[in-house]
Amino acid sequence: MVAVCVLSLSLAGLSVSAEPVKVGNPGFPYSVPGSFLTVSRQVKGQYGFKTHSGLWIRNVSTAWREDVCRLVPSVGGRDVEVTECVMRDGWIEAVTEKGPIEFAFARPDLLLVRSKSPEMHIRFEFQRPRQKYDFPSAFGRRIDYLHYNADRLLMDTRVGARDPDKGNTVRVHPSAGGIEVAILDIHTGDWDGAEPTGSFEDAVRTQKASFERMLASLPSVPKAFERARHEAAVLFWTTIAGPRGMFRRPMMLMSNNWMNKTWSWDHAINSLSLGYHDQDVAWEQFRCMFDFMSPEGMMPDMVSDEEIYWWAVKPPVHGWVFSKLRRMKEFPRERLEIAYDLIGRWTNWWLTRRDFDRNGLVEYLDGCDSGWDNSTAICMNRPPLETPDLQAFLILQMECLADLAKTLGRGEESAQWTARSQKMLDALVRVLFDANGAPRVRRLRDNGFDSASLSLVTRLPIILGKRLPEKCRARMIADIKEKGFITDWGLATESVNSRHYKTDGYWQGPIWGPATLIAVEGLRACGEDALADEIALKFCKLVTKSGFSENFDAKGGGALRDPAYTWTASAFLVLAHELN
């Protein structure tokens, strides 16, 4: 009861903003589910943007990985600045002093661009050719066929008129009704000669309904965080790429900026926030990276629509995530069978391919394997390393498999997974906690230990809760409380008291959503609900201040790195919902 009172008082100072979501502005591109095209206002030098400032259409396929064209409005021969973009119901406006330019997707591959002003002209400045065979071509009065090495775009000037082909710039002039242009993204095959169809009004209705479904599918949150929930829905809605190239199903990218890929633990975290009300979408996101699993059971580090990266892996959080998804709503038997097979193969890969000294504990070969790329616990010790977080995830994963096997009527297999989980738990406590209960990292190269690390990653075994001996739990809880991990904004990934702490140090200090989520889950499993609520609430307040950035300054709360990152939003939604 006391914790509830503290929480309600802590929320009292927060208010819900009525401002429109700033999608389409620097760092937060606008798109719709299934599309690879985005629209955003860019500022040169901001968020790594290198070309001219202005309003840009981009393609997030890694085959492009760059801007497609800049839209420059002009009135009376003078260029007009786009000052901001505003999301409406199913479309966005690029605001200028002479009236807006409007964008709506008739379908994922068809973007409509409209100005109702009879005075506004628009130049479509396509990027300079990368190769001599990258060029725009013109067909008659309306059609421009823009052939690039990576893709093809068809530009249909529906309302207004365009100049004849002049290099890489297409100039569209208004009629009495203004301008309307349809841009068709042609990824495979060739143009069939048919003009793209679909009205702007129909596009708005379709996308409005699509967004409302996304918003309704997300979990409830305290009223003070409702605007952040809405922004999370916009972020999710704009970052789901359709089946194309390597992608066999819709896949939520981490970002429509430069982190335009999916990683092999990010996807699992994202599935959690979707699982409360839309199990089908959650299942697609949970399963998507398993599409690329090797015959041996290895999952790649990351995947784009054009490439698979095998040089690293990511931590096996999938059993923990799937167990949590099952608690939200049980899956049909067919999906349980699939999950049992996939998670089982992934687990066996770790047990057979990453236990180099055959001592029952598995190893990371690289910081990226841990997901904490440059964590001091990893990079200061030099892999291969046995770390307590890795064993904790596998223990929970084997428990998940034991429970799945039991549900599926495979009693003998269930008992085997239970025994393997217990065996690893015993080894974890014996080897990777010292006599005082402190977590430590073991180096295979010299059989040495590091128990002095001030990286939060070594405290993540707290997710095992009361499976661990009391002294181990007590030590990690005390470390979190007393060793400089908790700041005004949440949990630092490296203690602020550490000599290795860096404000913008990636995993050497900044606050990350998934790390916060795992730690909070662990504190709850240990009965530390008040502390869990405190940390969760701080993180939720942080994203209302600084958005859904990749990570955050642990001391100042400022946004760092990629400014619109989906798993940050997912961590927020789960944390906020469980506060609710």
Predicted regions, residues:
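Alpha-helical support elements that line or immediately flank enzyme active sites
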Residues: 261-292, 456-469, 516-529, 536
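Substrate-binding cleft of carbohydrate-active enzyme catalytic domains
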Residues: 265-291, 313-357, 382-400, 572
